[in-house]
């Protein structure tokens, strides 16, 4: 059966296995004990007429992912296939192997400027030497991440506009590093220093830092402890504060030591306290 493939521009063309063979071969380069032909063979079973190029990419990813249980190195192959899809989304064009590094660095500068304009990133990020930072990106470090790592970053951490991600992994690490360096005297040097630390996975900041560093709501702390007063005003003021912290991924700890115990007298209402448990 002649399967038609729907391109991003809506045009239909006949499916040829050569393109997905090439994608699988690139994804498996330098990875031991994985077979690009097996990935392609299983992916072909999922094809159908008028399938989109994105759905073909997903079929390849799923095919590689299903093999991780038998051979863990398929996690790196699946990661590379997912990265290929991610790059297309970030670059907003096809990935050209000859100009890939240029596309990558260009996307970093463009995304910082675009996200500042959209009020998603702190305008002080424009004070950094963006061309210098783009040249400091070690693009090959994308290969350090396994499939689950890339998928988690894609689903939860990369900034999105109009439901499209705006950051490739090294751009993401650099954005986080810039946010951490924003008040440094040598902000460019410190950003590169932080970037080299976290992009090599020698240290990974906590989730709130990854979410919010460099953004217009730079809440970087993981956990907060708040003491609630034993009064209507204290309880609802505390709840409001906790909601604000939780909104930007802060972890919450409640000190309820001041709460009166079950059966204690409430002077204001001439009632009896139900204690802590019903309130919780």
Map each language-model feature to its residues.
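Extended catalytic cores of very large enzyme megasubunits
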Residues: 1-280
């Amino acid at each position: 059966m002649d399967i038609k493939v729907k391109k991003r521009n809506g045009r239909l063309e006949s499916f040829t296995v050569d393109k997905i063979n090439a994608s699988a071969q690139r994804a498996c380069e330098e990875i031991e004990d994985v077979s690009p032909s097996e990935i392609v063979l299983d992916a072909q079973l999922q094809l159908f007429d008028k399938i989109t190029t994105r759905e073909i990419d997903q079929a390849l990813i799923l095919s590689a992912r299903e093999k991780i249980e038998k051979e863990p190195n398929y996690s790196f192959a699946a990661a590379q296939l997912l990265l290929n899809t991610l790059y297309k989304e970030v670059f907003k064009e096809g990935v050209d192997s000859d100009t890939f590094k240029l596309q990558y660095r260009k996307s970093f500068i463009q995304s910082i400027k675009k996200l500042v304009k959209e009020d998603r990133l702190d305008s002080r990020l424009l004070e950094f030497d963006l061309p210098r930072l783009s040249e400091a990106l070690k693009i090959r470090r994308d290969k350090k991440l396994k499939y689950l790592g890339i998928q988690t970053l894609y689903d939860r951490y990369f900034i999105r506009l109009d439901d499209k991600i705006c950051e490739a992994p090294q751009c993401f690490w650099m954005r986080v590093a810039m946010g951490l360096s924003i008040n440094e005297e040598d902000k460019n040097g410190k950003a590169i220093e932080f970037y080299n630390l976290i992009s090599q996975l020698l240290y990974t900041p906590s989730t709130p830092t990854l979410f919010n560093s460099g953004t217009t709501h730079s809440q970087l702390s993981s956990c907060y402890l708040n003491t609630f007063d034993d009064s209507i005003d204290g309880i609802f003021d505390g709840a409001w504060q906790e909601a604000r912290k939780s909104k930007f991924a802060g972890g919450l700890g409640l000190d309820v030591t001041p709460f009166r115990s079950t059966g204690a007298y409430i002077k204001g209402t001439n009632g009896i306290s139900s204690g802590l448990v019903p309130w919780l």
